[in-house]
């Protein structure tokens, strides 16, 4: 196929030499009729050249019986032109008119450009070279190439552009190597720095020369990077457009408030970088299961007032997060610990203390009872009559005096005065109360012992013994002496009970 194209080019060059040697002005009048008198000399030369070209191409078509597909389009277009010019004396005017109608100014500009390309390397023509102009119209190919300076038929403009693109690809390879000298292409990603295939793909559109200074065609952000990298310095801090990639140097400046900065920090170099900088995290992100060195290294830097933070192990951090109680935050200098954090310490330290809602009053009450009892009994008002029988039931269970009076007096068991003098002076009431404080709150008071306690008016030791009678029911049940005196059992009036309650 290339040999066939070379033969056609040789024949056209011979025809052009004949055209330049002979001057033909025979059909000037008819060309002025068709063209309006503007380009009469050009049209007469073109019309006469069409006749000679068609005659020479008809001889070539007879000598080549089997031609490939790209060549067959050329021969089809030439054969259509040949059938019209087979009788040259009668149909030359029709051929001129049709060839003139096909042409437009953009196609008239092409032969002058294709001449310079032919002079460089004429025999090297790609396979799909002749497809471009012959697909425009079947009769165009004889007429386009027949001005004064044209030397080819099947040399379209795409072949030179294809050759320019092949040259551009060759020239783009050392440029790509020079710009990628430090970084391998796998580390590039799809950032703004990938510019080596851009020259090869887009070179068909612009015919500008390719080899230039290294960063002139590209974005202005690329040129200082190339100049630095050409010095062989690989430790270059990247500009801040590259902060989205997973480099440890670029991740230092990113203070991420959502805690996602700990996702990518797996390599030890990133852990070192993050540990040296102070990153304020939320509380939940700091409690994830991580090696404890990085968390507590920040604590020792930020919390200088609390030296025992670094001593806490990793398991306590996990327990605090699993209890759904907010743990101590990482910058604890600024605020006092909240109420949840104070309760969290109690939950960690005592595992046996299970607070149920029914007995929540029983858990808190011993300290209150002890404080009220110690404040009332240790004052100097102990020996006054009705104000010193301390009963928690007065604040918890208020009962009317009618229910107290319904009890029979035989159920009362009070210490005898002789027993109480011996025991109470040996151990005072405050130690007894302190001893039996927990048994008071955990055991339910029987209303029998609560309600039927009477005021004893005789001696101050009996006043103290009445407190022992009330607050120690287990001690009362062991006593065998029953008081049946009418002084203590029968003469207590409802007024005294009302004063007591």
Curated annotation (Swiss-Prot):
Region (Disordered): 61-274, 328-381, 478-501
Assigned GO CC terms: astral microtubule; cytoplasmic microtubule; extrinsic component of mitochondrial outer membrane; microtubule cytoskeleton
GO BP: intracellular distribution of mitochondria; meiotic cell cycle
Disruption phenotype: Leads to mitochondria aggregation and segregation defects.
Location of the protein in the cell: Cytoplasm, Cytoskeleton
Alphabetical UniProt keywords: Cytoplasm, Cytoskeleton, Meiosis, Microtubule
Keyword Lyase annotated: no
Feature: compositional bias, Polar residues: 61-95, 103-122, 132-168, 253-274, 367-381, 478-495
Bias type Low complexity, positions: 234-252
Entry annotated with the keyword DNA-binding: no
GO molecular function, one term: microtubule binding
Principal location: cytoplasm
Function: Involved in the cell polarity process and in regulation of microtubule growth. Has a role in meiosis. Involved in microtubule dynamics. Binds to mitochondria and microtubules, attaching the tubular mitochondria to the microtubule lattice at multiple discrete interaction sites.
Name of the protein described by the UniProt record: Microtubule-associated protein mmb1
Natural source organism: Schizosaccharomyces pombe (strain 972 / ATCC 24843) (Fission yeast)
Upper taxonomic lineage: Eukaryota, Fungi, Dikarya, Ascomycota, Taphrinomycotina
Gene behind the chain: mmb1
